Regions:
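Multi-pass alpha-helical transmembrane bundle typical of ion/small-solute transporters
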Residues: 1-283
Length: 283
């Protein structure tokens, strides 16, 4: 539940940032006001693409055999893990220039009187965030022990979007307590922890399919100290991949994951930004 709320919240804020930047720029430009209908049309098209992806995933899952579903869930969990890491790296690389890049695309549409270009730009941006949300949510559910109560999952998603609207409003105020930089820094850490959890969940599926050797199973037993099924241990299991009875292969690959993440972030952090543009000035 907490994972669903967090994922919807984080991705919705990012989508609102993109739409907010373009909306503000179009409203401030006399010629740009004609593009507002294309902006909202792009938002609708992007959401439709994300919903279509969700229906495809549900459809594929429904006609698979038990073993096929195990494979599909393993693949989706690992794909979601990779997508989270890619997203964090991309935002770290483009975050400070995102506003300028979006406005440049909008400016080009105005100059060429090509509003369909703006439509496509927005549709791709929203579809990207929506598709990431769909894959993350499916991967999160797949990495767990079951789909859970769909009504509760839907409620968590609605709550996540509501909190995203509030968060976006607070961030747009430009206060010192909550800034775009601090928001992305904190949520990047949480996303990477969640990606580690998705990795471990995917590995659990592969181990159950006898694809991966456990080497030693379990390598330790910490259930007497912290169970991974209740309380704090359950939260750590959901958000960081904690296991009270882990297989050695899972531990080794989890450590390898963090080494790769550290190397990627170090590589991206060492590359100079082209033109820093504070995102909080989007409106």
């Amino acid at each position: 539940m907490e994972q669903v709320l967090f994922i919807v919240w984080r991705e919705s804020v990012e989508a609102l940032l993109v739409v907010g930047i373009l909306y503000t720029w179009l409203r401030a430009t006399p010629e740009g006001k004609r593009g507002l209908n294309y902006l909202w049309g792009g938002v609708a098209a992007g959401l439709a693409l994300a919903v279509a992806l969700a229906l495809v995933l549900l459809g594929v899952s429904s006609w698979l055999s038990d073993e096929g579903q195990e494979w599909f869930q393993a693949i989706m969990s690992l794909a979601a893990c990779a997508l989270v890491v890619q997203m964090v790296v991309w935002m770290k690389k483009h975050g400070r220039t995102l506003k300028g890049e979006l406005e440049s695309g909008a400016r080009s549409s105005v100059a060429n009187d090509n509003w369909w270009g703006l439509f496509v730009l927005v549709a791709i941006a929203v579809a990207r965030e929506g598709s990431e949300t769909v894959v993350f949510l499916y991967g999160t559910v797949s990495a767990g022990e079951g789909g859970g109560d769909m009504a509760k999952l839907a409620l968590a998603g609605v709550a996540g979007f509501a909190v995203a609207l509030l968060t976006f409003w607070l961030l747009q105020l430009g206060g010192k307590m909550i800034t775009w930089r601090r928001f992305f820094r904190v949520t990047e850490i949480l996303l990477l922890l969640l990606a580690g959890s998705l990795l471990v969940g995917g590995l659990d599926h592969l181990i159950s399919l006898d694809v991966l050797p456990t080497i030693i199973d379990p390598v330790w037993d910490s259930s007497w100290l912290l169970s991974d099924s209740t309380g704090v241990g359950k939260v750590l299991a959901d958000f960081a991949g904690y296991r009270a009875l882990p297989a050695l292969i899972s531990v080794l690959l989890w450590v390898a994951y963090w080494i790769v993440v550290w190397a990627l972030l170090r590589w991206v952090g060492g590359k100079p930004a082209r033109a820093p543009v504070p995102a909080r000035n989007a409106s």
